[in-house]
Amino acid sequence: WEETIIYSCLQKVMGKLYAAEDSLGGKCLESAAACLGDFMFFAGKPCKELVMRKPDGYVIMVPQTEEWASVIKDCFLGTARQITRYAMRKDTVFHEERLKRMIKELPREYRLQPIDEELYDQCIAYEWSRDLVSGFESKAAYMKYGLGVVITKNGEIVSGASSYSIYRDGIEIEVDTREDERRKSLAAVCCAELI
């Protein structure tokens, strides 16, 4: 199952792995969950007990199979809703000149900046931008391992692209733009700079 969040957990870079306990209190390696940020991926033999160990708050549960999906629905009758998560093609061919041109065309009222400690705090402060950095366990962890850029306008973050998760061979990117600044290609500029 090729998912960057799972790679992050398996490689012990970030996130956590959970296994179900068997009837004797030992680990049951037939069922596992990878948990990072808002996501929890389930694999192996479907296990109700593992699903019920979800962290507090909002969680996007990703089943590997229809059997896992059924267990999740049964555990959270009336409170869970099914959505479709679209995977992006993992293409590593970029047109460098086009990316540079996009960055150069950013209007003057905007400023493109790498995420530093002050901008990290600003990302965390707003719900729309929190996921740019919140996958990391702390500010120190983001500063050490994270990679991201934001666009500011009048000192406030209006768009950003950042590593939601990292693993040895790459990153999964989180991209967000404040609602009143959307449809201006700001997210594309952030992505171009991050790449």
Region annotations inferred by a language model:
Residues 40-43, 170-172, 184-186:
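A short, polar/proline- and glycine-enriched secondary-structure boundary/capping micro-motif
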Residues 114-134:
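Helix-loop element at the rim of GNAT/NAT acetyltransferase active sites that forms part
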Residues 2-14, 127-148:
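Active-site rim helix/loop that mediates acceptor-substrate recognition in acyltransferases
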Residues 138-178:
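A conserved beta-strand-loop-helix scaffold within acyl/acetyltransferase catalytic domains
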Residues 5-8, 12-118:
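Acyl-donor-binding surface of acyltransferase catalytic domains
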